[in-house]
A protein has these predicted regions:
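Conserved metal-phosphate-binding beta-hairpin within the catalytic cores
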Residues: 142, 314-339
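Conserved catalytic alpha/beta cores of large enzymes that bind or transform nucleotide phosphates
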Residues: 218-318, 323-324, 361-368, 389, ...
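Extended active-site and interfacial segments that coordinate phosphate-rich ligands
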Residues: 141-174, 198-273, 333-364, 408-415, ...
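Conserved alpha/beta-domain cores
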Residues: 111, 119, 123-125, 130-140, ...
Length: 802
């Protein structure tokens, strides 16, 4: 018995989550949203639902319950051919069966009431809601059908029968067997909901956590033009937005990262000229593809809805939304518990490639694992049976129909799709790495060749030539010994920040800008500033990279700010020390346009780099771009845990000049402090030249502390080129001369009451050096992420000086 026993049809506003047994997870959740969150400003289109009781009585009235049970009991669901035959037979039985007169009458009455409330010209979506769907331990992602832009009661009645039939889709039957659900225990509720005119605007899916790492403090929004089915199906590569929950709550500009998708097609309402089709797919104009389909204001509003919904449900949520192109408002269309990352254990497996080879294809990484095997190229769904255990499935796009064979694959690679499409959801649930939205994977990868599919390197997934060796380490949460020194982390790639932030740490001792400039921008800053007065080839390259941004200059600042903000948000509120760019001239030359602007130096390691660049008139305008990005991260985004570090300061005069230059760009020491004095900007200097340690007291007059760069300090103390294999054996940070300078720098900072940390490679490679540094009284040790836990444990019991 349920509280709605005896009812065949119920309006959404009468439903709550306790009604899952009556109307399934999807429809119960719509009722919960309407009845409980409308006052919080969350808008949900109205509608009604048929009940599980109505579905079961429909089957009984047509003697379908026993017939269906008999054929399913005899079915081997692993036999794809038999599965397709039996599924088609059952669906035909259901579609051809008449609805009981009482059920039809109640649907007609509910439809008339809803139509009167919505007004003329409104159409409806008819969607499925299984009684075992969207529960925290199962995802029935897209297994039953949805029908869009359905108008008129006769069409609604017909689509409800088709929705009932979709409980017996091949993928749904297979999934129930795989998850251990008895077929007769699952019933179907049909939801009839007013359509939002997102065909005239945009729509998408959002999660209240990062889908790959499980990081909880962001909302991930995907968006594309038109109806949301193209995203859910994986037919488009959507735009992506990350919104930081703590800064959203603080009223700051909380969008920390955006990624422009290709958005090649969109689904829109079809008109009468298209016959019986209610929707159609059309190409998106090139100008629209080149811009984001959602404003920052709308992305922030969606994130606020997401936070309210998550707070109400008390768990991470998977939410579908639509922007109405007529009234300009945002609507929530569905909300269900996230079913993969929120269920994972506290033991973390980390995959790392031990080598690399030629990259054959790239796309969006799903999961964080590595898979390898022979490519199985499948152009047509009818050929999916060719996929054998251990194959790498490569196809244009997968939908949930492929689920019976997806679980055989060692990895999945597609041309189309984003991180919230059905294929991505199923791949995560099965624990299979997938690279989606490659664009050209089916052309770049030949059937039968051996490849390695890596999702372990951040947001970008790579398909490598050949079978590469992979290292898998497993860490479990557990207590770490208290230390007198903070253990921090070196982070270069913002795409890995959400994952790294979940390793025990006390902040970031070194966040490098070089990775952001190299990988997220790729263009020399002078080429950006000289645009459009550059040669045709360079202009084309800059135009292509800066699509979706107001200008190439805005693109550069946006991308630096987003990269830094992603790291700062991941570790909030712990300190994140960001080192300003320290490219050498040979490294700047490798950027697009770099050879036009950079000198060819004999020894760039000792050349035009660090603070010398910043204060040079030749580079001043380029440095201004970095400063603008840093100011945005702290002032507009509110991430005042960002501290700035100046590298390679040769003289005390240079130190004074660079601090004055930063102040002129709005980055003065102590600026941006809160009313209580907290959050003021700290400026840290890299102590990496012998002169820095020898004249430490003089340098410290201009900075709030030192971060020791042991790599450069060692090579400059011992006269070694650290890039030369000929003298590599002599490179050792534990050399007495180096340790004397380390001790000198640490003691000077302690005497001045200022911060002193180390961010070089030494402590990661040599735990004995880390222990010695603690004994000297160093404030923090910043380690590579893969050495943090082991080094921390090994240092238990080491004492600092009193």
């Amino acid at each position: 018995m349920t509280r709605h026993t005896g009812h065949y049809v119920l309006p959404f506003e009468q439903l709550r989550m306790i009604d899952v047994d009556s109307v399934g997870g999807k429809n119960a959740s719509l009722g919960e949203l309407i009845s409980q969150l409308t006052e919080a400003g969350v808008r949900v289109p109205g509608g009604f639902a048929t009940t599980a009781e109505a579905f079961r009585d429909f089957l009984k009235a047509n003697s379908l319950d026993t017939r269906i049970r008999e054929v399913l009991d005899a079915l081997n669901a692993d036999n794809v051919t038999d599965l397709a035959r039996v599924g088609a037979q059952i669906r035909q039985w259901v579609i051809e069966a008449p609805l009981p007169s009482r059920l039809e009458a109640e649907i007609r009455t509910a439809y008339a009431t809803l139509s009167a409330r919505c007004g003329e010209g409104i159409s409806f979506a008819v969607r499925s809601s299984a009684t075992a769907e969207d529960l925290p331990d199962a995802s029935f992602a897209g297994q039953q059908e949805s029908y869009l832009n359905v108008a008129g009661i006769e069409n609604v009645l017909d689509r409800i029968r088709h929705v009932f039939a979709s409980l017996y889709n091949d993928r749904a039957i297979s999934y129930r067997v795989h998850k251990g659900f008895a077929h007769h225990d699952v019933a179907l509720s049909a939801g009839v909901q007013q359509m939002v005119r997102s065909d005239l605007a945009s729509s998408g899916v959002m999660f209240t956590m990062d889908t790959e790492s499980g990081f909880p403090d962001v909302v991930l929004i995907t968006a594309s033009y038109g109806l949301g089915e193209t995203i859910v199906q994986g037919a488009v590569n959507p735009d992506e937005y990350y919104v930081h929950k703590p800064m959203l709550a603080a009223g700051k500009q909380a969008i920390i990262r955006r990624q422009l998708g290709s958005k090649l097609i969109k689904m829109e309402f079809a008109d009468a000229a298209h016959g019986s089709r209610s929707v159609r797919t059309v190409d998106v104009p090139l100008t629209d593809r080149s811009r984001y389909c959602l404003s920052d204001a709308d992305a922030s509003e969606l994130a606020r809805y997401a936070v309210e919904i998550e707070r109400h449900y008390g768990c991470p949520m998977d939410i579908e939304w639509g922007l109405d192109g007529i009234d300009g408002r945002l609507y929530i269309l569905q909300a269900r518990p996230e079913t993969v990352k929120s269920q994972s254990s506290n033991r973390q497996q980390r995959y790392k490639l031990k080598g690399h080879s030629k990259v054959l294809a790239t796309g969006r990484a799903i999961g964080q694992k590595v898979g390898a095997g022979p490519v199985r190229l499948v152009d047509d769904a009818r050929d999916m049976e060719r996929v054998q255990p251990g194959d790498v499935l490569v196809t244009d796009m997968t939908d949930p129909n492929w689920e019976p064979v997806m679980k055989r694959a060692s990895a999945i690679v597609t041309n189309r799709g984003g991180r919230t499409c059905h294929a991505a959801i199923i791949a995560r649930e099965l624990g299979i790495p997938a690279v989606v939205g490659c664009g050209d994977a089916t052309h770049k990868l030949s059937d039968g060749i051996a490849v390695t599919v890596s999702c372990s390197e951040g947001d970008t997934g790579n398909v490598y030539e050949g079978l590469l060796e992979t290292e898998v380490t497993e860490t479990a949460d557990g207590p770490l010994p208290p230390l007198p020194t903070k253990i921090m982390m070196n982070v270069g790639n913002p795409q890995l920040a959400f994952e790294f932030a979940q390793i025990p740490n006390q902040g970031v001792g070194l966040a490098r800008l070089e990775f952001i400039i190299n990988n997220n921008i790729g263009v020399h800053p002078k080429a950006i500033l000289d645009w459009p007065n550059v040669d045709a080839d360079l202009k084309r390259a800059v135009d292509a990279l800066s699509r979706g941004h107001e200008s190439p200059r805005a693109f550069y600042v946006d991308k630096v700010a987003e990269g830094v903000a992603t790291i700062a948000a991941a570790f909030w509120p712990r300190p994140v020390i960001v080192r300003l760019s320290d490219f050498k001239s040979n490294e700047y030359r490798k950027l697009i346009g770099g050879s036009r602007y950079e000198p060819e130096e004999e020894n760039p390691m000792l050349g035009f780099r660090g603070a010398s660049r910043y204060v040079s008139a030749d580079f001043a305008e380029c440095f201004q771009l970095e400063c603008e990005a840093m100011r945005r991260v702290r002032d507009e985004m509110g991430l005042v845990n960002v501290e700035l570090m100046v590298p390679f300061v040769r003289t005390v005069g240079e130190a004074a000049a660079v601090v004055q230059l930063l102040a002129s760009h709005g980055l003065a020491r102590g600026s941006g402090a809160n009313a209580d004095g907290s959050g003021g900007l700290r400026l840290i200097m890299m102590c990496e030249i012998p002169s820095n340690a020898l004249l430490a007291e003089d340098f410290l007059q201009h900075f709030d502390g030192f971060s020791i760069g042991s790599n450069d300090l060692t090579q400059l103390t011992l006269g070694l080129d650290r890039d030369s294999a000929l003298v590599a054996a002599a490179f050792d940070e534990r050399d007495p001369a180096v340790k004397q300078l380390l001790a000198r720098a640490i003691s000077a900072c302690r005497a001045a009451g200022k911060y002193v940390g180390i961010c070089g490679q030494g402590p990661s490679d040599h735990p004995d050096l880390a222990a010695w540094l603690i004994e000297q009284g160093i404030t923090s040790i910043s380690l590579n992420p893969d050495t943090v836990v082991d080094t921390w444990r090994s240092l238990g019991g080491v004492s600092a000086p009193q």
